[in-house]
Amino acid sequence: MASEGDSIDYYELLGINEDAQDQEIHRAWRKTSLKYHPDKNPNDPKAAEKFHMLQLAYNALIDVQLRKAYDSERFAKLARKRREEAFNFQRKSMVDDLRERERQFYDSLEKKENERDRLQEKLRALQEESANLRRQRENRLREEQEQSKRRKQETPSSKISELDRSIRIRWKRKYADQVNDAYLRSIYSSFGTLQNVVIQKDISKEKKYVYSIIVFETLSSAYSAINAEKPSKIYDVQWLKPPKSNSNTPTEKDTTVEDYEEITIMRMKQKHKQKQKENERKATSTMNA
């Protein structure tokens, strides 16, 4: 999830608290973005950059899933910063203490030789401890980076299209009454959160197979479903968007042109229904306003 806004605290940028609600976020974004709108500052490139960052902050905080992911990463960064500050303070204290002891040692001409040896031994011990602390810190940072990488892989990203997270499932028509929405969800939800399940409605007797499209929330979930052993009633499971191939020879499992057209029509119908629902929600919201 590394991006141009990683070093910016979105809450500070919008001037809001961490527990701010959607209404507060929207109000703060609207007020600040109007101030830095490029149309009002045509000769100030920094204003355009600030306006862009405000839009990124608003998009990240207004979306529940993106805000949850951002808060998790932000908390980890703050915790890491506090640990680094504590480590630097501890190391500085150790160095200051060591220098003070050395100063006392060299200022005191009456100290015996064995006292100097003892202090030198302690110096080596402190250096060893400092090296151990540094190794521990490096290990923690490496572990946190790996955890952050795993979290990013599980976070919904606009860079991964819905098509890339979609799989196509095919089963024989004789199982049409058994393989339904509930059946598919019970099996494939075990691989991760499902965004949508679309099943072919018009099943012609001439058709040998029935199709379904499942859209996962993450690419890794779709990948797991593709590579898992398929249930007995399922004929095959493939990517909806097939990988590029240099071979022009069709295989036994290749989707025909007609099959792909049916799948495309299913997706278009589903998109149309979603758009209708969205328009109805907007109309209801306008009437209630």
Curated annotation (Swiss-Prot):
GO annotation, cellular component aspect: cytoplasm; nucleolus; nucleus; spliceosomal complex; U2-type spliceosomal complex
Keyword vocabulary terms for this entry: Chaperone, Cytoplasm, mRNA processing, mRNA splicing, Nucleus, Spliceosome
Residue ranges with Basic and acidic residues bias: 129-148
Keyword Protease: no
GO molecular-function term, one example from the UniProt record: nucleic acid binding
Region (Disordered): 129-161, 269-289
Any one GO biological process: spliceosomal complex disassembly
InterPro entries assigned: DnaJ_domain, DnaJ_domain_CS, J_dom_sf, Nucleotide-bd_a/b_plait_sf, Pre-mRNA-splicing_ERAD, RBD_domain_sf
Subcellular location: Cytoplasm; Nucleus
Pfam families: DnaJ (PF00226)
Sequence similarity: Belongs to the DnaJ family.
Subunit: Belongs to the 40S cdc5-associated complex (or cwf complex), a spliceosome sub-complex reminiscent of a late-stage spliceosome composed of the U2, U5 and U6 snRNAs and at least brr2, cdc5, cwf2/prp3, cwf3/syf1, cwf4/syf3, cwf5/ecm2, spp42/cwf6, cwf7/spf27, cwf8, cwf9, cwf10, cwf11, cwf12, prp45/cwf13, cwf14, cwf15, cwf16, cwf17, cwf18, cwf19, cwf20, cwf21, cwf22, cwf23, cwf24, cwf25, cwf26, cyp7/cwf27, cwf28, cwf29/ist3, lea1, msl1, prp5/cwf1, prp10, prp12/sap130, prp17, prp22, sap61, sap62, sap114, sap145, slu7, smb1, smd1, smd3, smf1, smg1 and syf2.
Function: Involved in pre-mRNA splicing. May be involved in endoplasmic reticulum-associated protein degradation (ERAD) and required for growth at low and high temperatures.
Protein name: Pre-mRNA-splicing factor cwf23
Encoding gene (name): cwf23
